[in-house]
Amino acid sequence: MGSGAAAGVCVQPADASAAERVRALSLFKGGFLRDPRTTPERHATSRLPPPGASGLPLPGRGGRADIQEEADPMTDRECVELLQWAAPRLRLRWEGFRRVRGQVCKRIGRRLKALGLPDAGAYRARLEAEPSEWDVLDALCRVTISRFYRDARVFEVLRHDLLPARLESLRSRGEATLRAWSAGCASGEEPYTLSVLFQLGLEPRFPGVRLALVASDADAGLLARAARGCYPRGALRELPRAWAERAFPGPGDEPCLAPEFRRAVDFLQQDLRSQMPDGPFHLVLCRNVAFTYFAPPLQREVLSRLVARLVPGGLLVIGGHESLPEGDFGLTRAAGPLPVFARTDV
Ligand SMILES: C[S@@+](CC[C@H](N)C(=O)[O-])C[C@H]1O[C@@H](n2cnc3c(N)ncnc32)[C@H](O)[C@@H]1O
């Protein structure tokens, strides 16, 4: 398990130069490894059509603020239409972006400006003409919101019930390692939460056990931030206070995670649609990525592959607002209404 067991680029969090290597790869390799947000943009002069020229309503255009943001080449509606058209081609579902589209639309707007394109229609034409632009759009569509201890009730049930039961059973078999995977780990908030929970919440009760944690994400820029391990205080607000004080001892607005909480985590750059670590895992966190943004057929494919990477009785955690696709995937609920499932079919 871990870096050796999986295809993809591995970053050890304590190794800043490795993080830089991932970043450099993302800039030079192209394809899914490309991170256009870190690519210098060509600044074009605005070639906006006059207001209303697109024939669509004008939300967000025409007011004073809009004069300041005159260079914004897309209305919200144009962006929505672009996403509705493009998402299926990326095996994504537009509905997942509905509530969080602001972040994505802003990025696409910046991309249009960088390319000197006047509107969403011109961007569609660019996509049709240049297949490599789809990789750029794909990367622009990644929603990056995360925080420590997100969905606190899930971490509480893991800490008090589900993981102690798993550790008891490991111990009874003479095993000492809990293997876990955070899929779509953003800047490390989720895997580091698990690392802190394990060390401060579980190790004192189960001395001698260890956590081996793989964390994967498609986005090299986020993985570089994860490797750095420093966060605005707002990202820590749900973490139990005593743990936050232990894990982030430094002063300032952007404290850094203490080294002992980083050691358990191996970061991998992988696209969940095509790559996964081998496993098997006792615990997989796949929250606010596949079951929000992926198209239903892809959700089913990914779910089958996730389940195949769980040990018998292994746990799958999804996001608080997500549900699993219909069908028998060999899972049962493991924590009442909370989005935690256990593998049953083995
Ligand atoms: C909304 S964040 C969720 C982060 C964390 N799991 C949580 O719930 O707080 C979604 C993450 O999934 C990543 N992501 C999106 N598409 C992906 C893909 N195809 N493969 C791997 N990671 C992906 C994004 O880069 C982003 O970091």
Regions found by a protein language model. Name each.
Residues 4-7, 11-15, 19:
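Residue-level detector of structural "landmarks"
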Residues 327-346:
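Core SAM-dependent methyltransferase catalytic element
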Residues 187-204:
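Conserved SAM-binding loop of SAM-dependent methyltransferases across substrates and taxa
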Residues 183, 204-298, 323-325:
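Extended basic-aromatic, gly/pro-enriched interface segments that bind polyanionic ligands
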Residues 72-181:
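Conserved AdoMet
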Residues 313-320:
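Conserved beta-strand signature within the Rossmann-like core of class I S-adenosyl-L-methionine
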Residues 300-312:
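A short glycine-rich, Lys/Arg-flanked "PGG" loop and its adjoining helix->strand segment in the class I
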